[in-house]
A protein has these predicted regions:
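Short, charged low-complexity linear segments at domain edges
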Residues: 1-9, 158-161
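Iron-sulfur cluster-binding cysteine motifs and their immediate structural context
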Residues: 1-5, 18-42
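Short, ordered loop/turn segments at secondary-structure junctions
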Residues: 1-2, 11, 61, 99
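Short linker/helix segments within small regulatory modules
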Residues: 8-18
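General secondary-structure edge motif
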Residues: 8-9, 23, 66, 143
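Short, flexible active-site loop motifs that bind/organize anionic cofactors or intermediates
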Residues: 9, 33, 149
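Generic non-transmembrane alpha-helix signal with a bias for helix starts/N-cap capping motifs
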Residues: 12, 22, 79-80
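Iron-sulfur-associated redox domains of electron-transfer enzymes in respiratory
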Residues: 36-197
Length: 197
């Protein structure tokens, strides 16, 4: 019928469900009726705004697979071509998320070493905090393990913070005029960007 709606259990808002925002419902919908939210218009508006500086980060998985969606062979879809395309679209600065992933790993490693020094005052094992879907899964399904999660930001969140501090300082940019954009392979990253923590 024309009044049919699709929603989560008991029509609860998504933030009150156990949904991890993994996107599997989108990939497995037999008729393709479900779609992710597109932020393309917001991105293009930021690029067109002369008062804004757009800084984009590219996830490693995107870097290796971006050409498939436009019919390029693996050998043709190089990082150079991707950067060139992003520059032609109008992005001001382009970074690889590998940079902030290294920072996250160093942060988690330091935290782990601190935990080792004071074993009795920390919960074990220590879990990574890199994936927002994983974080949400632990918080909703196994809240007793929330204290086991690393306090380090994910690579995406780490880069967002660095783009408004270190990179802004190095490039002489006003942090309030920076629009940090992520090109990621995972829908839970959109959820992560919306979480105020």
């Amino acid at each position: 019928g024309y009044r049919t709606t699709v929603g989560v259990s008991q029509n609860a808002p998504f933030d009150r469900t156990h949904c991890t925002y993994c996107g599997q419902c989108l990939t497995h919908c037999p008729v393709g009726a479900l779609r992710e939210r597109s932020d393309t218009e917001k991105t293009l508006e930021a690029i067109a705004d002369p008062d804004k500086t757009t800084i984009v980060q590219i996830a490693p998985a995107v870097r290796t697979a971006w050409g498939e969606s436009i019919g390029l062979y693996k050998e043709e879809s190089t990082m150079g071509k991707l950067i060139s395309a992003l520059r032609q679209i109008g992005f001001d600065y382009i970074f690889d998320t590998v940079y902030s992933a290294d920072l996250t790993i160093m942060e988690e490693g330091s935290e782990f070493l601190e935990h080792l020094k004071e074993r009795d005052s920390h919960r074990w094992p220590m879990f990574t905090s890199c994936c927002p879907g994983w974080i949400r899964f632990v918080r909703t399904e196994y809240p007793e393990f929330t204290a086991n999660l690393s306090t380090a930001k994910s690579p995406q969140q780490m880069f967002g913070a660095i783009s408004k501090t270190y990179i802004a300082h190095k490039l002489g940019l006003d942090p309030d005029k920076i629009v940090s954009i992520s090109i990621m392979p995972c829908l839970s990253k959109k959820y992560e960007c919306s979480v105020p923590e």
